[in-house]
């Protein structure tokens, strides 16, 4: 299984739009937390990101499966909010979320609040890898980027990755920023083993067998041989017959079945043969399970908030969270705006 990403300028623009999973406001049916009625603040701005990733009771068996996830030559000279997720394997969870809030000049006594909360839990998962290489790489990418950048690259199984940003700005004198992350991983089972490498070999067999046989031949019943005058049968007239039963002179009935002819025999049996063919055989072991995660020639000349997660293997949990709150006691009319 292979996942590769090369972003075009159009894809960059779409990623910048689609990666915003929560926006502080009243549109779309989402409502931010209500202000405290006991507070003396007349207004404010709130940005909140709450994320939960759960991965449990799954079972995956890989036999020689190749999982390669890579980002190469992409996300260059981008600005704004950019989120990229690349995964290869099974049951991987990735997300990039941003929440932005800005209060105008009328909320001069308000408070700017930004917070992120991330919960990742993985339990009861079973992973069996047999000669299964996992490779995750970020190469020559995300250079000269400014703004908020989140990149997740995972190869394998049951990996959880998060990049979250919450930012709020207000003309109020107070600002609050909070960030919380919880990751739990219990009751998981991972088995990494090398798989057999099967082949075949040509075989040639020769067979030589010796044996012997011993037995007795006996006449059963009375037999009478006819005699004729002519040279051919039935040429001429019948002159009589010859008795070969037990009543003949000197005859003996060997097996007491009425016959007088008995022969003892003895012989040898000689068996020879050649067998050849092709049979399967175990000729060794394939390459054992290998997990490679690499970052090369990337993230150069970057400014702003950058979160990058690269994971190879199984059951990895990664999170990058940032909360920014800006308040101002002497801002000009119109307030400030965030540069994202």
UniProtKB/Swiss-Prot annotation:
Segments annotated as FapC_R repeats: 67-100, 134-167, 291-324
Span(s) of short sequence motif Cys-X-X-Cys: 328-331
Instruction: Specify where the region named Linker 1 lies, as residue ranges.
Output: 101-133
- Annotated signal sequence is 1-24
- Give the domain of life: Bacteria
Q: Which GO terms describe its biological process?
A: amyloid fibril formation; cell adhesion
Name the keywords, alphabetized. Answer: Amyloid, Cell adhesion, Fimbrium, Repeat, Secreted, Signal
Q: Name one GO cellular component term.
A: extracellular region
Instruction: Quote the disruption phenotype from the UniProt entry.
Output: Deletion of the entire fapA-fapF six-gene locus shows no visible growth phenotype.
Q: Where in the cell is it found?
A: Fimbrium; Secreted
In residue numbers, the region (Linker 2) covers 168-290
What the record says about family reads: Belongs to the FapB/FapC family.
Summary of subunit composition and partner proteins: The major component of purified amyloid fibrils. Fibrils are resistant to boiling in 2% (weight/vol) SDS and require >90% (vol/vol) formic acid to dissolve. Interacts with FapA in vitro.
Q: What does this protein do?
A: The major functional amyloid subunit in this bacterium. Upon overexpression of the endogenous six-gene locus (fapA-fapF), cells form large clumps during liquid growth, make large amounts of biofilm and produce amyloid fibrils.
The name on file for this protein is Functional amyloid subunit FapC
* Species the sequence originates in: Pseudomonas aeruginosa (strain ATCC 15692 / DSM 22644 / CIP 104116 / JCM 14847 / LMG 12228 / 1C / PRS 101 / PAO1)
């Amino acid at each position: 299984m292979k996942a590769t990403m090369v972003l075009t300028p159009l894809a960059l623009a779409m990623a910048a739009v689609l990666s915003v999973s929560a926006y502080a406001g009243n549109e779309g049916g989402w409502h931010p937390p209500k202000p405290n009625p006991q507070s003396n603040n007349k207004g404010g701005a709130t940005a909140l990101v709450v994320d939960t990733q759960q991965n449990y009771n799954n079972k995956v068996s890989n036999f020689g499966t190749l999982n390669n996830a890579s980002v190469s030559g992409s996300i260059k000279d981008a600005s704004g909010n950019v989120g990229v997720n690349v995964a290869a394997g099974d049951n991987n969870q990735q997300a990039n979320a941003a929440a932005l809030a800005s209060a105008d000049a009328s909320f001069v006594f308000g408070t700017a609040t930004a917070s992120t909360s991330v919960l990742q839990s993985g339990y009861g998962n079973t992973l069996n890898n047999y000669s299964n290489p996992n490779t995750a790489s970020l190469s020559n990418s995300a250079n000269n980027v400014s703004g908020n950048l989140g990149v997740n690259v995972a190869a394998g199984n049951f990996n959880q990755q998060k990049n979250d940003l919450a930012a709020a700005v207000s003309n109020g004198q107070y600002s609050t920023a909070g960030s919380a992350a919880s990751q739990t991983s219990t009751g998981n089972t991972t088995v990494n083993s090398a798989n057999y490498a099967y082949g075949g070999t040509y075989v040639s067999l020769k067979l030589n067998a010796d044996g012997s046989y011993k037995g007795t031949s006996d006449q059963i019943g009375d037999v009478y041989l006819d005699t004729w005058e002519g040279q051919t049968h039935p040429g001429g007239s019948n002159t009589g017959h010859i008795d070969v039963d037990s009543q003949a002179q000197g005859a003996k009935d060997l097996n007491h079945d009425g016959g007088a002819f008995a022969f003892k025999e003895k012989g040898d049996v000689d068996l020879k043969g050649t067998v050849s063919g092709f049979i399967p055989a175990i000729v060794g072991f394939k390459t054992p399970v290998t997990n490679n995660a690499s970052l090369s020639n990337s993230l150069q000349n970057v400014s702003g908030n950058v979160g990058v997660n690269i994971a190879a293997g199984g059951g990895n949990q990664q999170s990058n969270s940032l909360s920014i709150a800006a308040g101002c006691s002497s801002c000009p009319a119109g307030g400030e705006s965030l540069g994202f």
